[in-house]
Amino acid sequence: MDTAEEDICRVCRSEGTPEKPLYHPCVCTGSIKFIHQECLVQWLKHSRKEYCELCKHRFAFTPIYSPDMPSRLPIQDIFAGLVTSIGTAIRYWFHYTLVAFAWLGVVPLTACRIYKCLFTGSVSSLLTLPLDMLSTENLLADCLQGCFVVTCTLCAFISLVWLREQIVHGGAPIWLEHAAPPFNAAGHHQNEAPAGGNGAENVAADQPANPPAENAVVGENPDAQDDQAEEEEEDNEEEDDAGVEDAADANNGAQDDMNWNALEWDRAAEELTWERMLGLDGSLVFLEHVFWVVSLNTLFILVFAFCPYHIGHFSLVGLGFEEHVQASHFEGLITTIVGYILLAITLIICHGLATLVKFHRSRRLLGVCYIVVKVSLLVVVEIGVFPLICGWWLDICSLEMFDATLKDRELSFQSAPGTTMFLHWLVGMVYVFYFASFILLLREVLRPGVLWFLRNLNDPDFNPVQEMIHLPIYRHLRRFILSVIVFGSIVLLMLWLPIRIIKSVLPNFLPYNVMLYSDAPVSELSLELLLLQVVLPALLEQGHTRQWLKGLVRAWTVTAGYLLDLHSYLLGDQEENENSANQQVNNNQHARNNNAIPVVGEGLHAAHQAILQQGGPVGFQPYRRPLNFPLRIFLLIVFMCITLLIASLICLTLPVFAGRWLMSFWTGTAKIHELYTAACGLYVCWLTIRAVTVMVAWMPQGRRVIFQKVKEWSLMIMKTLIVAVLLAGVVPLLLGLLFELVIVAPLRVPLDQTPLFYPWQDWALGVLHAKIIAAITLMGPQWWLKTVIEQVYANGIRNIDLHYIVRKLAAPVISVLLLSLCVPYVIASGVVPLLGVTAEMQNLVHRRIYPFLLMVVVLMAILSFQVRQFKRLYEHIKNDKYLVGQRLVNYERKSGKQGSSPPPPQSSQE
């Protein structure tokens, strides 16, 4: 077998020839050591990599130039290449300027001017619209406002397309379909209610689609059968009107909807990329897209803003409510919402009339338009109105906590209505979000089926838009009212009542100090940055808080279960938990046997009816009902309310009290914002609970292990403190002081005044600058500082390497900062006076040397960059004119320099 000893190419498995010699360009050995240059180049083009995928060694090529190439390029060649590069740059600059002008100037400006023209309400504005388009008055403000208008129209367009997809794939409501509902596998109509009523209480929570937003708390069980009966009655009425032609039209319509995204649409989407659509590929096709975007903006402004606004405006004027709407400071928004409400009523009336006269295509079009308006209004109510109500109710119930009155809130609303409403909406959204998060935590602890009246947000079938499409409007209205009652009652229980108790028991504890000014000697900026950079990351980035809360909920549930004999109801039985896997398998098999796959005409309604026809609700576990079960449930609710009240009292008093006591050592008797005291108290409480939980976890391991762990943790804490002093103390202080000397002092302090430096402010700003520099470094290219920071992050606190951090990170950074601070000072204070200059010149040099040296460093960096760019241009010109090929460089093991030979010039690599 002589061929086994011959050198062959790793790709084509051929031997080397004088015309095609073999090379060994990387560290690989054995049968994959050698390769032809042509094979390697072909493989590199295919893989789009410049290194060996096995040994990670970068391949090197040496350029081959023409024999008549001079040692130095002639001036005329360099000048010609420079002119060509400048011409290419100018052409690209003109093109990208045109692109930016079109998308950032023409599109938003036309949108804003058309919007103002339509809402001016005069014919003269419509006639002068072409001249207004060319006007340069308020150009920047109109562009910014136009960007907002364009964003709204694009969001509306995307929402319409997405809503259409929801209707196509999820199925339209039953009342919108033309034909009679198809039969399911059991032989019943799709809209018939199930015969069995067992477990209706638990099934109803999983019954139709999940509630539309996070505020619908109360389930819809009592009216499930009524709703199905109403839908059945509607469908039976529609059956009398629909014929064979209608069924064919419905099937064809559904088929047309499914064929809307055909292959040609996919092919067109593949050809249209973002670069081509925006004009970043160098073509002028984007001008057509600009025209279509402007037309789309005009159409959407006219249809979705102009028409509803004027419908609402004429209606309010006719009813005499115009003055009340104007007094709300949100005339445009309220008028538009009223217009949409009237439009929805008009559409549903026209839909009914079209049904009576059997205009089936018009009937379907009117129904789809009604669904669009209905979903839009429900989204506004769920995401806008409900959090706003919660935010205002929270504010009203907490007025005594801040020593405020309703008159103060009215004055703040009159002075800044938009800001006030946004802040209250934001507070309400936070409240709703944390309430939903707490419900998710409860589901992890309690028995499946306990919270049957609450939505399961983790349900994979959860789709609020489908609920908005399918459920009638009165059910959404009822859910909204019940949710407002439930959320409002919780606010009364956990905020208003604890405040009343605190004021009666601790009269001097309230109100909280929330003034925007402070007479404390410590800078507000320092406290804010300390809060944002130290306290909040520790409280938010740790997963221990959720585990502690989950443990408290589990302990409370176990206690309440044994006290009230509701352990089986709350947590389930152990025997049932052991057999839960078998039950789940049986339930899944039962579900597969009963659930019919919905066809095109059925959609989501059939899926919901399939869920209803199961033997029990999804995820339900049976439980044992003790005697006097309703009374025990009532006592459980009372016990829960008392627990929530006590927990709220502790949360409102303990952190603030601890924070005030600790901050008094720092600020004395001066009053500061309660945000800082509460944050400080929460941080101390968190540290205390964390230490207690760690000690409790160590207790079962014995005294020797505890001493060993205490020793390890003490050593780790000492190392961490040293690193914190260097990296979180010295480095930010030097960085903030350097920023003060280079930027702040020359800009803010005149030459005839002496700048004052505040170490706390400099340190706080330095912390912010250090985090920004670290983030930019980690996002940038690979260099020694990024490598060191990544290594420190990878080690973490438990494996902290003090020697590595001091030697590789702290010492170099501190040395550079000290040199940046000391060298200019030595020059200004030690060298300049020896030159015999005047005192004014010495003061000028002393105050301006830091920004001057910064400018020198920046100019040197720019000059170095330009030199590198000129070298690249020189190589590019030389390669374009004299390069005839490239030769692969062999890897030499014995020579480190050859083994790590640098890659060829970028312009010559292929």
From Swiss-Prot:
It comes from the Eukaryota. It is a multi-pass membrane protein. Residues 113-142, 305-336, 398-421, 502-519, 654-678, 743-764, 837-848 are extracellular. The RING-CH-type zinc finger domain is required for E3 ligase activity. Residues 223-248 have a biased composition (Acidic residues). Pathway: Protein modification; protein ubiquitination. Residues 1-91, 164-283, 358-376, 443-480, 541-632, 700-721, 786-815, 870-910 are cytoplasmic. This is E3 ubiquitin-protein ligase MARCHF6. Zn(2+) 1 binds at C9, C12, H36, C39. GO terms for molecular function: enzyme binding; ubiquitin conjugating enzyme binding; ubiquitin protein ligase activity; ubiquitin-protein transferase activity; ubiquitin-specific protease binding; zinc ion binding. The keyword Transport does not apply.
